[in-house]
Amino acid sequence: MYESPIILGSKPCTLNIPGMGVLHGLTVLDENGKEKCHRFTGIRYAKPPVGKLRWRRPVTLEDGYDYSGDYNQFKTICPQPFYNNRKNQVRNPDFKYDEDCLFLNIWVPAGEKPAEGWPVLYFIHGGWLQVGNPLHYRQCDPQDLQADGSPAKFILVSPGHRLNLFGFLAGKELLEEDPKSSNFGFWDQRLGLEWTYKHIESFGGNKENIAVGGISAGSYSALFQLIYETYHPEANQIIKRALLLSNGLSVQPKSVEESQIQFNELAQKFGIPLELSSAEKLEKLRAIPFQDLADNILNLRLHTFRAVTDGDFVNPNTFKDIYDGTFGKRIRDSGRELIIGEVNNEHSIYANTNPPKSKEDLFNQVNNYYPEKVTKALLELYPKVPDMEDEKEYLAAIKALFGSIVSDMQVYASTRVLINGLVKGGVPLEKIYRYRIAFRGKFFDKYEPPESLVPHAGDLGLWFYNVVDGILPEEIPIYKAWLKSYGEWMSTGKTDWGTTKTEEYRLLDADGTIKVVDDEKWDWGLKVGRTVAGVFGLN
C-alpha cells in the first residue's frame, strides 16, 4: 500500500517567485512525453521543531526567507513506529525519517490555469496521528488526476506534520513551561494551511477557493481545522469546504490531566524520575535522540498519542457542539459544504491495528484511543464474546469485536453523529454530500485480496485516479463518472449528488454503478453516538 510513485518520465521545471526565490521542481510526463503535472516537494513552511523547539508550537520562518533550491525529491518524514497491519507489509526504503519534518508537497496541473486560478485541496494524510507521510506513496500520487482528460483538476497541497509523541505528547510539565504547549501536530497543520493561503497564488492557485480534506486521521484533522476556523472568527477564514474521507469525531478528546499517565509512563521508560521538576524532566526528554523515542513507542502500555482537550485548539465543548447542533449552526451560517463518507469494509484495518492480545487486553487497547469512562460504556454496549474452548478462535472473536468498536467510533458512528448534528443545526441537505464506496479497481488485488472488499483507505485510488498504478481501460469510465461530480464540487461547492434525505447516501457500488440508497447503519451509528453522549451527560 505504500510503494513509491511510478514516474514514467520527467523533466526539470523552474518557478521564479519574486520575494521568495527560484524553486526547481519536477514536471511529470506520460509515456509519450506529454506534461501531466508539476511537482514541488519538500518546501519548508516552519522552522525545524528540534532541540528546544521539540514540543513547542511551530515557529514561522523569518520574513524574507529564501526558498531558492531543489524541490524534486521528497524530504524527511516525522519519526514513527511501524504498524504491520496489512499482509506482507514492509517499510518503504525510500522513506527517510527525521524530527525535521515540517515540509509541504505541492502538485500543480500542467496546462493553462483557469482565469481565477486552480482550486486548491489541502489534503492531510492518515495514520491515526501516529504514522504516515504527506503523500510520498503511489496510491495518493495525483499525476493522472491533474493530467489532460481528468474531470477533477486542482492543485494538491499536503503537509508533513508532527505525529505520535512528537506531535501529541501532553502533560502538566509542558503547560507549566508554556500554557500553549499541546496539540503540536494540529498547529503544524494550521501553519501549513496559512502558508498555503499566503503563497499558493504563486503556484497558480486561487487562495479564495481552498478546501481542506484528508483520509482517516487526516479527515479527523481536517474536521478539527474546520472547527478551529469556525470558532475563531479572528483567524483567516481560509477553508471553503471540507472533504472528510472515513473519519469524524466520536468522543471528546482526553483532557491533559487524563494524558498525564501517558507522559509519566514515557518518562519512566527512559529512567527519568517523576520527582524531578517539570523543567528537568523536559530537559532530559529533549536530550533523547528522536529515533530512541520512536523505537520505544510500541513498548508503552499507552502507545497511542492523540489530540487532547486543551481549551485552545480543542475546546472542551467540541463533541457536545457537534452532537447537539451548535457546530452545525456555525457551518450553516458560514455557508460551507462537506463531503462525508466511508468504504464498505472499514472494520478490517482497525481490527488489525494494535489488536488486543487477550480478553483482559481489550479494555487497554480501546482505552488507548478513548477516555476510560467511554471505554467502559462501549464495552457494555457491544455484545460480549462468549467463552470458547478453542483459544485461537476466542482471540479472533475478541479481535473482531475490537475492530467493530473502533471502526464504528472512527468512521461509521462518528460520521453519522456529525451528519445528524449538521442537520440539527440547519445545514441544508444540498450542502452535505454523503457517500459510500463499494467498488474497487482490479489493480487493488495486488495490495489486498478481493475478499477484503474495500478496506479502510482502499478508496484512495479512486479519489486520486491512479491510472498509472494499473486502472484498466474498461474501468476508466467508472472512475471518471465519480470524479466528475467531485471535480465540480471542488471548483464550485455544488454538484448534482442525487440524495434527498438525511438517511441516504450516494453509493459507488461493486459493479461500478452509481445509485442513491438508504443508510442501513444510520440507527446503529446514532445509538453508538448516544451511548458516548450519555457518558458526558448530553442526552
UniProtKB/Swiss-Prot annotation:
SUPFAM superfamilies: alpha/beta-Hydrolases. GO terms for molecular function: carboxylic ester hydrolase activity. This is Uncharacterized esterase/lipase C417.12. GO terms for cellular component: cytosol; nucleus. Transmembrane segments: none annotated. Its EC number is 3.1.-.-. The active site is at S216. Keywords: Cytoplasm, Hydrolase, Nucleus. It is found in: Cytoplasm; Nucleus. Coiled coil: none annotated. It comes from Schizosaccharomyces pombe (strain 972 / ATCC 24843). Belongs to the type-B carboxylesterase/lipase family. It comes from the Eukaryota.
